[in-house]
């Protein structure tokens, strides 16, 4: 019978002395005087009849903590000896150690291979395994299988023979250092055994000992090492030792077999809650100071044998499988969603963290641990599908996320439209009073300019004079005499606390400022004044015949019989100046007629009608050809800016968004941040998918409108690339800063005004209009079917678009927040278009490309056909038509011409049809946008917010009155002592500065109190860095608050003036928990 197929026991042992020295004595045929102690062991299934007994009987019988072996051993010993003696049993002895090869690292390594056959040998083995009795070395010597044992050591012996030159010198190479290949082959074939090892040990004892000690590197482990590594409980000491060292004696760093460290194994065994009897040895963990006690304790444990031990392996394997299955489920969801979930980078990071948090938050983990806890002693553990961790996460999170991957489901499940229906008469009046007058409609012939255009300061004075004239007749003045500013913070004047420090402390503690404001109160700026004037339709019914004009708007325009609403424009002038314009009628044809297709291009456009619109590639190339024909025909465009506002009005013009009016055209400010230049054919193909996604979303959002994604127009305008050396002035930064009510936000972030058109970057990259018509001819459209072979766009980092989509009749939008939400929905709709992602996705740096910051009252957006202004006064980057012809377009030339109609690219244009507005979309609800941010905030509220108030925490410590005097007394008497002790330990020598310190309360909030420490000596020094020279002492603060673990904490922070410490910025040094000493301050 093959010895490898016999019943086998794998046994980990230790000795009181050096285990390597005693083992080498046995291997070389000598008898050691030091016995062996069994630490842990395991067996093969064919020995279950010996080691696995009726567990219920073991549990129910009463066994004293210390039992005399002579009384209880006889019957059990006879039964075990009978089972043992009926077969031969292999016993393999192990020591901690082994080889490390690639990804595989052994934890234990065999040293003896024995075969037990006689009753005497089995009796000694029984006492060692059942009661931890020392195993006599004579037993090992008598049962040692020489051949199998030295098969284990053959490689070590061969290596030692080579390294100690225990070969014929003729086998060496000429240099005497390397063994020849022939000699190595001969050595490998040569069998080695006890004789070779004995010879090596006799002649090279130090080298042999060193080699074996390197191999069995755990030979010197003490009992304390086992307790520390595998303890501290009996269950983990016995079960984790056996599983970690004998049942998984090798660590595999592969994906197929997940690598669990020892702490993880110990944690897994905590949920294996099978009842166990007290240890028969009578020892506690603290008593195990020698190997004889450790062996007796481990071998006498209930966890060593029986059903408890047998089921432990099955349980831990199933537990690992269950845990890894749940974890991999999250990874699979994330991997699959990564391909289809196209969201901005910030949102995707939030998604990754949220996905893990939804599966592994405290409640989910607690439920999972409860589900996998096993306490059944008899039945085999079955943990398959016991945990619903992944299912809950799928239901609560992933299903909601995946609804964003289908446009119809996304809008149905995430978007709630609040729509108000108007009657025909009300709708007609509402349309007239809330949209621009018909004078804005494009006219083929030049018309007379009626309006006003001047510098901001001039217009401000003009408006003030007009309001003074009309205020006696019912006009409500918009300019207060004393604009409000900051409320004085009297509590802080004598504390020396800077406003920056207070803001930093407020921000750190998530509390509002003292006055409860969200920003500075400022007077209305010129932008708000002009928007108010332009949207007003009249004044009170007083007799104003004594005035030159009937309405303030007529007085502002300087022309009678004009009615509003009217568009308000901002005009960027050279050197950072700006002007504003309110226009009732304009010569739009003089602006747009220069951007017409030439006669020969019209003939080509007629030929392009023959292209099959269903052919996506051909249609994209057709659109590219039309765009290039226009760009090459543009001539006599001024590139020099003017300081005269009325002249500059025709070079740069930006429409101001007016929340007082309704939105009839959706204007999207699109900026694609790209990795590399995009071929023009690819760009046109991507924008065709962009158009289809927008119109598909509108079809779903406006169910009572007739929307045809294959026919309805969508107008694209692309910016032109400036000269490489031109520094572009971000003219959207020139907006009137006083038009912002939340100006403190911009001041705190180092900006006076956030860029509107370029909200996040200052670079502007435009489409190249210098490509000659000879590069792409009509032959390209019919012959070139590869969009990737078209010439690349010259934009290197960013491509800017203006996309104008008419709101379908009879709908209109109202409100800044509504339009922002609408733009976010459309961005998601575009990302759900497969063609868009396939064509343009590989070129994009991120998937956030629609800027919603422009949809705020008083913000402006540059109109098509106008340029930006550089710092040198040069006009660059015109917004030129970028044609995307609908599939079912009947008249291509008419579609091209409609790009020049200003009624198609103004926010508040009057609908060109005679159908009045009937449905007003005034709010968008649901989780259509910022889903991840809302989920993060909700989870933070649930899991990270304190459950007890600061008042309650202080009352538990005897502070019943939350006034400044009581709080200061509490800090001085209770908290400062803990602070000084902490500083003495972690900042030696600095505690002297805090010995005579007192506190001064400077801010009391609902969940946060701020104190400033007053030094009684020379002053405090910086605790962050040692600064040179005599610097002003930093301010030191302590804040009292309750953390998310419901602990009352005190934080010490400093405000140092040194540059190294961020120049007076508040920095928290450390945080301590306030001990719970009730009634400390009651006296």
Swiss-Prot record:
Annotated compartments: Host nucleus
Subunit structure: Associates with the helicase and the primase-associated factor to form the helicase-primase factor.
The keyword Cell division belongs to this UniProt entry's keyword annotation: no
Keyword entries, A-Z: DNA replication, Host nucleus, Metal-binding, Transferase, Zinc, Zinc-finger
Any one of the GO BP annotations: DNA replication
KW Zinc (keyword) present: yes
GO cellular component: host cell nucleus
Pfam families per UniProt: Herpes_UL52
Its EC number(s): 2.7.7.-
Organism: Varicella-zoster virus (strain Dumas)
Family: Belongs to the herpesviridae DNA primase family.
UniProt protein name: DNA primase
Residue ranges covered by zinc fingers (CHC2-type): 1022-1061
Site (described: Essential for primase activity): 669, 671
């Amino acid at each position: 019978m093959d010895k490898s197929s016999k019943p086998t026991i794998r046994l980990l042992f230790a000795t009181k002395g050096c285990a390597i020295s005693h083992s080498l004595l046995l291997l070389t045929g000598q008898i050691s005087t030091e016995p062996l102690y069994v630490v842990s062991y395991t067996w093969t299934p064919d020995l279950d009849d010996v080691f696995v007994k009726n567990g219920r009987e073991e549990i129910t019988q009463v066994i004293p903590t210390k039992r005399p072996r002579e009384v209880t051993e006889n019957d059990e010993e006879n039964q075990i000896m009978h089972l043992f003696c009926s077969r031969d049993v292999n016993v393999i002895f192990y020591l901690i150690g082994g080889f490390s090869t690639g990804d595989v690292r052994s934890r234990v390594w065999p040293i003896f291979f024995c075969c037990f056959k006689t009753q005497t040998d089995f009796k000694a083995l029984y006492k060692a395994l059942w009661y931890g009795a020392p195993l006599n070395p004579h037993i090992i010597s008598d049962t040692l299988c020489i051949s199998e044992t030295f098969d284990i050591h053959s490689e070590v012996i061969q290596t030692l023979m080579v390294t100690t030159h225990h070969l014929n010198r003729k086998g060496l190479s000429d240099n005497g250092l390397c063994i020849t290949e022939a000699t190595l082959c001969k050595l490998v074939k040569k069998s080695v055994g006890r004789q070779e090892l004995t010879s090596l040990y006799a002649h090279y004892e130090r080298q042999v000992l060193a080699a074996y000690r390197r191999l069995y590197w755990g030979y010197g482990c003490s009992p304390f090492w086992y307790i520390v590594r595998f303890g501290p409980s009996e269950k983990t000491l016995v079960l984790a030792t056996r599983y970690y060292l004998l049942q998984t004696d090798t660590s595999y760093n592969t994906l197929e077999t997940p690598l669990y460290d020892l702490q993880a194994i110990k944690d897994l065994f905590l949920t294996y809650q099978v009842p166990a009897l007290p240890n028969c040895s009578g020892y506690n963990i603290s008593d195990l100071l020698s190997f004889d006690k450790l062996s007796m304790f481990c071998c006498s444990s209930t966890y060593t044998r029986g059903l408890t031990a047998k089921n432990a392996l099955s349980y831990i394997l199933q537990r690992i499988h269950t845990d890894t299955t749940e974890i991999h489920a999250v990874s699979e969801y994330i991997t699959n969603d990564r391909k289809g979930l196209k969201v901005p980078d910030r949102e995707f990071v939030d998604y990754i963290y949220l996905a893990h948090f939804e599966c592994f938050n405290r409640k989910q983990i607690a439920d999972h641990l409860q589900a996998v806890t096993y306490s059944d002693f008899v039945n085999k553990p079955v943990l398959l599908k016991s945990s619903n961790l992944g299912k809950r996460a799928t239901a609560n999170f992933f299903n909601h996320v995946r609804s964003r991957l289908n446009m119809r489901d996304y809008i149905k499940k995430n978007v709630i439209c609040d729509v108000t229906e108007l009657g025909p008469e009300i709708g007609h009046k509402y349309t007239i009073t809330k949209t621009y007058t018909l004078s804005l409609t494009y006219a083929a012939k030049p018309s007379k300019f009626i309006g006003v255009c001047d510098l901001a300061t001039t217009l401000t004075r003009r408006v003030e004079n007009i309001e003074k004239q009309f205020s006696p007749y019912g006009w409500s003045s918009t300019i207060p005499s004393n604009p409000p500013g900051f409320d004085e913070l009297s509590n802080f004047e004598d504390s020396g606390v800077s406003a920056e420090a207070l803001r930093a402390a407020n921000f750190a503690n998530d509390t509002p400022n003292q006055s409860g404001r969200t920003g500075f109160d400022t007077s209305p700026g010129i932008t708000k004044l002009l928007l108010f004037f332009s949207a007003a339709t009249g004044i009170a019914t007083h007799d104003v015949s004594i005035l030159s004009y009937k309405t303030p708007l007529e007085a502002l325009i300087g022309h009678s019989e004009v009615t509003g609403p009217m568009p308000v424009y901002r005009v960027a002038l050279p050197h950072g100046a700006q002007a504003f314009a309110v226009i009732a009628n304009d010569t739009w044809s003089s602006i747009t007629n220069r951007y017409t297709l030439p006669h020969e291009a019209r003939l080509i456009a007629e030929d392009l009608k023959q292209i099959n619109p269903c052919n996506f590639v051909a249609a994209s190339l057709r659109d590219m050809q039309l765009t290039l024909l226009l760009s090459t025909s543009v001539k006599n465009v001024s590139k020099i800016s003017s300081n005269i506002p009325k002249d500059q009005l025709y070079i740069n013009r930006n429409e101001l968004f007016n929340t007082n009016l309704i939105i009839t055209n959706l204007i999207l400010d699109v900026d694609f941040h790209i990795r590399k230049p995009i071929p023009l054919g690819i760009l046109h193909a991507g924008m065709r998918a962009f158009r289809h996604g927008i119109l598909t979303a509108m079809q779903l959002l406006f169910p009572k409108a007739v929307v045809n994604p294959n026919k309805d127009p969508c107008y694209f305008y692309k910016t032109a690339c400036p000269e490489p050396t031109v520094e572009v002035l971000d003219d959207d930064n020139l907006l009137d800063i006083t038009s912002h009510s939340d100006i403190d936000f911009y001041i705190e972030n180092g900006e006076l005004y956030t860029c509107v058109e370029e909200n996040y970057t200052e670079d502007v990259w435009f489409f190249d209009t210098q490509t000659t018509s000879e590069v792409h001819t009509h032959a390209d459209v019919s012959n070139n079917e590869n969009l990737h072979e078209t010439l690349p766009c010259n934009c290197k980092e960013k491509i800017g678009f203006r996309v104008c989509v008419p709101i379908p009749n009879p709908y209109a939008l109202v409100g800044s927040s509504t339009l922002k939400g609408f733009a976010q929905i459309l961005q998601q709709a575009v990302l759900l278009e497969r063609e868009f992602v396939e064509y343009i996705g590989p070129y994009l740096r991120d998937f956030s490309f629609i800027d919603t910051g422009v949809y705020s009252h008083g913000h402006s957006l540059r109109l098509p056909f106008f340029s930006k202004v550089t710092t040198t006064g040069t006009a660059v980057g015109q917004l030129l038509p970028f044609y995307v012809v609908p599939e079912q377009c009947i008249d291509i030339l008419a579609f091209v011409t409609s790009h020049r109609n200003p009624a198609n690219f103004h926010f508040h244009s009057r609908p060109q049809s005679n159908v009045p507005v009937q449905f007003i979309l005034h709010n968008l609800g649901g989780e259509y946008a910022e889903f991840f941010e809302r989920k993060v905030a909700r989870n933070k509220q649930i899991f990270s917010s304190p459950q007890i108030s600061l008042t309650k925490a202080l009352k538990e410590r005897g502070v019943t009155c939350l006034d400044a005097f009581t709080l200061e007394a509490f800090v001085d008497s209770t908290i400062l002592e803990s602070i000084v002790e902490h500083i003495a330990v972690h900042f030696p020598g600095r505690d002297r500065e805090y010995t005579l310190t007192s506190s001064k309360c400077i801010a009391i909030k609902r969940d946060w109190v701020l104190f400033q420490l007053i030094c009684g000596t020379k002053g405090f020094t910086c605790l962050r860095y040692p600064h040179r020279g005599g610097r002003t002492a930093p301010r030191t603060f302590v804040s009292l608050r309750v953390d998310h673990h419901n602990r009352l904490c005190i934080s010490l922070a400093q405000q140092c003036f040194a540059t190294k410490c961020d120049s007076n910025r508040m920095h928290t040094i450390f945080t301590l928990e306030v001990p719970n000493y009730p009634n400390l301050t009651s006296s």
